[in-house]
Amino acid sequence: MSKMPLLNARELAKILKKLGFELKRQEGSHMFFEHTDGRTTVVPNHPSEDIDRGLLNKLVKQDLKMERERFLRSL
């Protein structure tokens, strides 16, 4: 099983858009994305920092409701 890559908020936002998510709003340092099927996720937007692998795993599994390998193939 591959390790989750280190991604920053901009890179993750591009991947989410590719997967069909749309940026609905941004409040402070958090971006709120929504999919047409109702799935939602919030991504912290700190430009100089990568998103922690633990948080990225949580987003993929719980928010995106995707298998980790499917997410990695979408990179």
For every predicted segment, state its role.
Residues 1, 45, 60:
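Generic anion/oxyanion-binding catalytic loop in active/binding sites
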Residues 1, 25-27, 35, 71-75:
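Ribonuclease/tRNase effector modules and their secretory precursors
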Residues 1-27:
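N-terminal first-folded block
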Residues 14, 41, 57-58:
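N-terminal, well-ordered alpha-helical segments
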Residues 19, 30-31, 69:
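Short non-domain terminal segments
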Residues 25-54:
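A short, structured beta-strand/loop element
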Residues 48-75:
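C-terminal structural segments of small proteins and small subunits
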